[in-house]
Amino acid sequence: MIIDEILARKIFDSRGNPTIEVEVYTDDGNYGVAAAPAGASTGSYEAVAIPVDDAIAKLESEVIDQLIGEYAADQEEIDRLLHEIDGTDNFSNIGGNLSVALSMATAKAAAASFKMPLYRYLGGAFPTMPYPLGNVLGGGAHAKGATDIQEFLVTPIGAPNIDQAVYANTLVHKRVKKLLTEAGIICHKGDEGGWAPQIKDSKAFEIVSKAVDEVSGELGFEIRFGLDVAATELWDGNNYVYKDTKRTTEQQIDYIAGLIDEYNLYYVEDALQENDYEGFARLTEMVGDRCLICGDDLFVTNVSRIEKGIENLSGNAILIKPNQIGTVTDTYNAIRLGRQYGYSTVMSHRSGETTDNTIAHLAVAFGCELIKTGVVGGERIAKLNELIRIGEEIGNDRMTESPL
């Protein structure tokens, strides 16, 4: 399974922005295809995406000749070569968007050569299903003028199988709309398909909490509530700036801890700005026994930043975004390191997505407890439906154990 051809094209993501799709062909007649997503609220330490036309030009001028003739199943070597060709620590030369699409497409080509689904090729014989974590309401960078908190999330940790888990999140999403409509609130959608009404955070908590309680009662299993605060977007260098108030770091920690207890939150992502390891540690010490304190911008799927978090006891969960770090190997290394030190891992989409379903396979292959991939919208459903298909193969009731 020697790589003998690589093609790339410009396609468009769910926001209508250009992105790159890569095809990798092997000499045994198999191939893999993958596309790069893009974020709206991005961490400063992420792999750098470059303009698509530039990425395609870099592929043709600097990358293809180096990869043709390589063994597609040697993922570590392929990804090492991508780093070597790029020559920077953040893929700012060839582009993290090119590297992640090429790395994932190579893995899919190798899996096809072995006549195996990607999750089994990468992950082995005993996979389990992650719980879906979906955005049902939000604002922030995903919907200007709506809530300060970027995402109000739900996850059905009591669901008996992946089918019911996906269904539960869709019901909560619909129930949120019903409650908003009954309250006379106009419903729009944000980038990820969550409702984006122009309401205060307090009203959003009231509505989502009620929707979760109602649907959980109707289905007969536990559904929990979570947040992506995206606090770096609120931070002005001194305070967290909300529409109607400012909070110091200490006030922000107390505010988030209070919300966790008031609403029995299961998951809080990016509660503090991307460099506040100490603040994350304090919050984790306060509430980490009953809530996942997850770092996204804090860790950016980067081993060196995760190591710093481990040293400081910052958080107890890591958001995993392959395009933040640029390759499948680096993604796996981040997950492996976190797991060694007791961190839960959450595979994640981006706000600008395509119908590429690779992250569904990566979540299963690498044993992530949760997968954050929205609730509705074709580019979100593509991942959720792929999880259902995977569930048919491995047993859709083989849900992972809830980390809390």
From Swiss-Prot:
Listed pathway(s): Carbohydrate degradation; glycolysis; pyruvate from D-glyceraldehyde 3-phosphate: step 4/5
SUPFAM superfamilies: Enolase C-terminal domain-like, Enolase N-terminal domain-like
Principal localisation: cytoplasm
Binding site for (2R)-2-phosphoglycerate: 150, 321, 350-351, 372
Cellular localization per UniProt: Cytoplasm; Secreted; Cell surface
One annotated Gene Ontology cellular component of this protein: cell surface
The protein's name: Enolase
Provenance organism: Methanocella arvoryzae (strain DSM 22066 / NBRC 105507 / MRE50)
